[in-house]
Amino acid sequence: MFSFTKDIGMDLGTASVLIYIKDKGIVLNEPSVVALDKNTGKLLKVGADAQAMLGRTPGNIIAIRPLREGVISDYEVTERMIKEFLHKVMGFQLFKPRIIICVPSGITEVEERAVIDAGIQAGARRVYLIEEPVAAAIGAGIDITQPEGHMIIDIGGGTSDIAVISLGGTVVSASIKIAG
């Protein structure tokens, strides 16, 4: 069946953002950095281009990491960063994509809502969330629907998540703010 929309997977990490497009694989792997003109608020660069500016900018240009410890610390900048990355990998699209975004297992409902809202405002038709250990297990080819426990450890740039997964869900999990 032909689909007008794209399905996108996004790892919105503290250190980097990865974007996966169905049938294409990983199409973006860039640092979670945004360069802004602090006088005007204008977004100048995102990702690797913004990271290259760290420590090398005049006083009116600042480089920001809008995620801290696995969650959004600057909502508006995160939304703009997601929008730029989506435009970079998709160009202009008549139909909005569905996006599944990885989140740490221990985030609050408010933090979940912020991720969903940022994705919608950035141009997604629908945003789904998946816990990082579950996404890691699926990515590793583990059949998480089986009645077997699998311990998964996901060490990211802002959090480390540990979970036992069985029968399609998380049995127990912990997320700590210590990471690589």
Language-model region placement:
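Nucleotide/phosphate-binding catalytic cleft detector across ATP-hydrolyzing
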Residues: 1-155, 163-180
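Metal-dependent DNA phosphodiester-chemistry modules and their immediately adjacent helices/loops
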Residues: 160
